[in-house]
From Swiss-Prot:
The lineage of its organism: Eukaryota, Viridiplantae, Streptophyta, Embryophyta, Tracheophyta. It is found in: Cytoplasm, Cytoskeleton. SUPFAM superfamilies: Profilin (actin-binding protein). Pfam families: Profilin (PF00235). This is Profilin-3. One of its GO terms (cellular component) is cytoskeleton. Binds to actin and affects the structure of the cytoskeleton. At high concentrations, profilin prevents the polymerization of actin, whereas it enhances it at low concentrations. By binding to PIP2, it inhibits the formation of IP3 and DG. It comes from Ambrosia artemisiifolia (Common ragweed).
Length: 133
């Protein structure tokens, strides 16, 4: 399966038969290289990706300033150190799951709930980890 198919079929999917979908999603390498993305995934800056990687390595570094994706500021919520970062921005948010080689990212807005986004992103991330990726 191609990386784009993972984004299209597993991240941008109908969530639990509700007819709701993530706003955008992507799979990236740890260096910030985009492997696959939805058509509307925001164009992030290299320094934003560096901040995300640092947060995975040293949890709490983004808490004082927030996490930025394409200039949009997300308040960093409790995640799982070294494995998951969750952020909130208004009625929406972001979930990022780190695997051995990739970052699986999902951005959502209402009516998608935070837990639904987390489930979709983390399920794919866990699958990739199980596959040695």
């Amino acid at each position: 399966m191609s990386w784009q198919a993972y984004v299209d079929e597993h991240l941008m999917c109908d969530i639990e038969g509700t007819g709701h979908h993530l706003t955008s999603a992507a799979i990236l390498g740890h260096d910030g290289t985009v492997w696959a993305q939805s058509s509307n995934f925001p164009q992030f800056k290299p320094e934003e990706m560096k901040g995300i990687i640092t947060e995975f390595d040293q949890a709490g570094t983004l808490a004082p300033t927030g996490m930025f994706i394409a200039g949009a500021k997300y308040m960093v919520l409790q995640g799982e150190q070294g494995a998951v970062i969750r952020g909130k921005k208004g009625a929406g948010g972001i979930c990022i799951k780190k695997t051995g080689q990739a970052l699986v990212m999902g951005i959502y807005d209402e009516p998608v709930a935070p837990g639904q986004c987390n489930m979709v992103v983390e399920r794919l991330g866990d699958y990739l980890i199980d596959q040695g990726m």
